[in-house]
């Protein structure tokens, strides 16, 4: 018993010795397409034209971290995917130009259905999409380089709250079986996680928000560029800490900005990341091009993020560590396109690679998955993880499509008729893959 206790103490001392003084920097770069660019919009197959107007600008945001021996970067952009080809090219560029190794890099999309498509996905290639993809890649590299140039001594901390902005969308209907709908009894993770980085005076440098919801408040009849509720949430928090917003005084004490936290300018950089939202839609969605709900739901998330921030305790000491691996699962092709039904057939197809990226910031585990993960996989990982502060960031470092949990295949829903994965592999491969990497930390 004494021997094991001594080993535990030595392990803790070794971990503490590896920790260094944290430095953090952040930046945002505009990736809004030029007005009139001939670009298709992403996410809805029944759109017949490219975007026609710009409602709100969209951004690539980056946080760069340094513990004295290791540097890491997190990039989040207000687009639908990170195509695997784009990840490969971008990770090499960031490694080459910023000196940040790919195993310490997470590049994630908020899964915005109100943004242009990138080349390398399902959208047919065109000179316009190729040019826009180059613009986005350049912007991401620029954001990382600017964030690195702004590195400064920092403290960090994480806290969680809840927000009732999402709802399970897999609904059992009487005539069509399971399909897209509104299922308040279905599994849904309401956790809103807020990771704060501040300078040594207490002013926020950046935030990372993590919440499981499709960025689809605006539907297929919308032809205006928007960051949807993800962009609205980031914008609210940025403007709050810049001092540009003055919420009602009866919204709670935390919504009164303290002078020492006022950043000014454009405020701190706020990255929104999508949790396991493959089966999670906004609790309310818009018709046509009315953006009222985008702003309302974004503000609900933003206000709650500010309230959660009030509970965060920060620490200047940190250890950074990253690792990535690719797990491969048997593939399939559903014989007919997605439509409501109770049965379907499929053919064998190529195996599907799923990239897992684990970024550890002390005892905070950021688990990136290259796909559209259903909620129960994330909930299982959080239960089994040895780290209580475990966040799943989806649409990260590639695009493997829908990733259902094993039990979900029994309900023939939209996600099941579009996934490229056979059942029985991905859930275990993802959870066990992350647990294995955590053991190596």
Give the role of each language-model region.
Residues 1-7:
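Sec-dependent signal peptide recognition
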Residues 302:
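Charged, flexible cofactor/metal-binding loops and thiol motifs
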């Amino acid at each position: 018993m004494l021997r094991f206790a001594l080993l535990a103490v030595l392990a803790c001392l070794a971990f503490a010795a590896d920790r260094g003084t944290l430095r953090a920097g952040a930046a945002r770069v505009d990736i809004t397409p030029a007005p009139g660019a001939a670009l298709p919009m992403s996410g809805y197959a029944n759109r017949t034209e490219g975007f026609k107007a710009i409602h709100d600008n969209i951004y690539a945001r980056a946080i760069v971290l340094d513990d004295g021996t290791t540097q890491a970067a997190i990039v989040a952009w207000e687009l639908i995917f990170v195509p695997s080809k784009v990840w490969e090219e971008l990770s090499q560029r960031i490694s080459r130009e910023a000196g940040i190794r790919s195993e310490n890099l997470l590049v994630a999309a908020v899964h915005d259905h109100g943004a242009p498509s990138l080349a390398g996905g399902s959208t047919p290639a065109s000179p316009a999409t190729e040019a826009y993809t180059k613009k986005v890649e350049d912007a991401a590299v620029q954001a990382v380089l600017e964030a690195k140039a702004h590195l400064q001594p920092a403290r960090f901390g994480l806290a969680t709250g809840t927000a009732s902005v999402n709802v399970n969308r897999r609904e059992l209907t009487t005539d069509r079986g399971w399909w897209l709908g509104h299922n308040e009894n279905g599994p849904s993770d309401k956790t809103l996680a807020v990771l704060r980085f501040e300078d040594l005076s207490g002013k926020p440098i950046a935030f990372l928000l993590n919440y499981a919801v499709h960025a689809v408040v605006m539907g297929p009849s919308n032809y205006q560029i928007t960051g949807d509720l993800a962009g609205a949430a980031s914008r609210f928090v940025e403007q709050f800490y810049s001092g540009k917003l003055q919420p009602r005084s009866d919204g709670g004490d935390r919504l009164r900005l303290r002078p020492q936290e006022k950043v000014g300018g454009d405020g701190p950089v706020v990255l929104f990341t999508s949790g396991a939202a493959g089966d999670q839609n906004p609790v309310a969605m818009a018709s046509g091009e009315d953006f009222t709900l985008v702003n309302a739901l974004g503000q609900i998330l933003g206000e709650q993020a500010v309230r959660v921030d009030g509970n965060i305790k920060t620490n200047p000491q940190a250890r950074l560590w990253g690792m990535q691996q690719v797990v491969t699962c048997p593939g399939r092709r559903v014989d007919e396109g997605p439509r409501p039904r109770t049965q379907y057939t499929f053919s064998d197809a190529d195996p599907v690679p799923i990239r897992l990226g684990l970024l550890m910031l002390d005892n905070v585990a950021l688990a990136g998955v290259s796909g559209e993960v259903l909620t129960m996989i994330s909930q299982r990982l959080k239960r089994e993880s040895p780290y209580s502060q475990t966040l799943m960031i989806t649409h990260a470092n590639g695009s493997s499509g829908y990733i259902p949990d094993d039990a979900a295949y029994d309900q023939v829903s939209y996600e099941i008729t579009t996934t490229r994965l056979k059942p029985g592999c991905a859930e275990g491969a993802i959870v066990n893959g992350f647990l294995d990497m955590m053991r190596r930390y």
